C-alpha cells in the first residue's frame, strides 16, 4: 500500500496561482496570519499552503526566531507550517501588512509596490484542501526552499527557529524541476487554453515532489508521520491500516503483521506518529467518512460500514467525538457551505487579466 498516495487521494490538495508581484526597493510586507489565510484565499478550505517563486532579484524573509533567509531568482519557497512572517528588500525595514496593499482577485493580477528602486519579482500561489490531515502536515517543517545551483537542486527545510536539517543536493530530477518551474512561470505570464487546470496541476506536482523529498531526506532523526512511514515496523503497520481501514484491527494484529511484539509496536508508533495505532485508525476513519459525506449520496448506514463501524449508532458517536457534530448535521452544513461559495471557488481558482506583465 502506497500510504502517501492514499492520503493525498483523500485529502485532495488543489493548486492555484494567486498573483504576480513586482516590488521595488525599498519595500517590506507582513504576511497575513496563518489562521486568516483560508478565509482570505480559499473560503471553506481547512488547509492553505502558500508558495512563492522568485523570478528576478533578491529579497529577505524573516520568520519567527530563525535567521533571515535569502531569497534569490529561481527559488521556490513553500510555507507549510510557517508563522506570520515578513518579506523585504533589505533587513531592518518596517513591514506593512500585505492585506493593506493587496486584495484577493478572481484573476491573476500583477501587484506593484515599493519605492521605485531595484526590482524583485515573484509568482505567488497556494495549495488548499477542504480536509486537513494533521499527521502529515504536522510532520512538515515550517518552510521549504528549493533552488537550482549549477544544474543541481538544493533543498533546505527550516523550522521557526533554525534549519530543520542540513541542505540536501540532488542531481537527479533537476532538469524536470527546472522545466516545471519555467512552465509554471511562463503559463502565468502568457496563459494558453486550459490555463487554470495547467497551473493547478503544476503546483500540485511540485508540492508532491517536496513531500517525497521530505519523506526521503528529511524525516530521518525526526519524529512525525513521515518518519513513521520510513520506519520498517511502524510503516508496515500504517500500510496495513490504510489498505483495510474497515477491518476490526487490534494492536496485536498490527504487531503480528509488522513482525514485532505488541509492546514494541505500541511504543514505537506512539514515539513517531504521536498517537496510538487505534487513535490513528479512528482519525483516519473520520477522514474517509468526511470524504464520503461530502462527495457521495450514500446513507449513513452504508458509510458506517465502509469505514469500519458495526452500527450507525457507533459511527454517530465516534463522528461526534472527533468532529464535534453528528454526521448528518456535518453533511448538511458542508453542502450549504459549498453551495454558497462563488463559482470560481468550487473548482480551480485561477483566471487571467490583461495585466500580466512581470
Language-model region placement:
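An amphipathic alpha-helical interaction segment
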Residues: 123-133, 139-145, 149-239
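Generic protein-terminus/edge-of-domain signal
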Residues: 1-69, 75, 84-111
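A short, N-terminal "cap"/entry segment at the start of jelly-roll beta-barrel domains
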Residues: 1-30, 142-172, 340-357
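Basic/polar phosphate-binding segments, predominantly the helix-turn-helix DNA-binding elements
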Residues: 205-215, 236-287, 304-329
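Short helix-to-turn junction characteristic of helix-turn-helix DNA-binding domains
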Residues: 54, 241-244, 292-293
